[in-house]
């Protein structure tokens, strides 16, 4: 049976972030995820998780300077010290909040730059992250982002992400399989889910093409949910979508699992 985590960066935005934990619990979720926790102390977030009996399924390393177009530092040559500091900070939060995994953001490759150089830096930094997290039994995730959402991100295909995981060669590094991005770039989700089971440790969902609720658009999510059960996937499925209207009003798709 699939287990769903509400994405608090995109859902329940009708209320301030710190109030979204209670909203997610009231809606029937057992877990949450979000992009970045760093504007809040670990104690503030821990209090919300404990009060609402929620598991934290996932968060990301810091993005860098979003206003300057950055979306992660771990692939950027010459920024290794900052990337390591972001990874170390993420580990502090993961330990304090009992989160089993963190998505390490790669970054954007500027036009005209050598993508292979950026990829080599990312490989080294993912190994650093994996080695920092491994003694604590925690996982590192990498995620492919489709060009329409994040142009010039280091990698857009699930197969590029898989190749990175293979080259990193650490037992605690996995794919973060976002079916919205995967369908846009690669398609053939059945093949990805079946043939690469065990390579992904977190899943995210959204309707295509508008990234709304998973009952909207071209992806047959009831089929995919059965498929995840079939292959024995035990991880969380993060609901990283933009509600069409009020979050609660769009949760009809979730009724069977509340």
Curated annotation (Swiss-Prot):
Its EC number is 5.3.1.35. It holds the Pfam family AP_endonuc_2. PANTHER family: HYDROXYPYRUVATE ISOMERASE-RELATED, ISOMERASE. It catalyses: 2-dehydro-L-erythronate = 3-dehydro-L-erythronate; 2-dehydro-D-erythronate = 3-dehydro-D-erythronate. Catalyzes the isomerization of 2-oxo-tetronate to 3-oxo-tetronate. The active site is at residues 143, 240. Mg(2+) binds at residues 143, 178, 204, 240. Keywords: Carbohydrate metabolism, Isomerase, Magnesium, Metal-binding. Belongs to the hyi family. OtnI subfamily. One of its GO terms (molecular function) is metal ion binding. GO terms for biological process: glyoxylate metabolic process. It comes from Escherichia coli (strain K12). This is 2-oxo-tetronate isomerase.
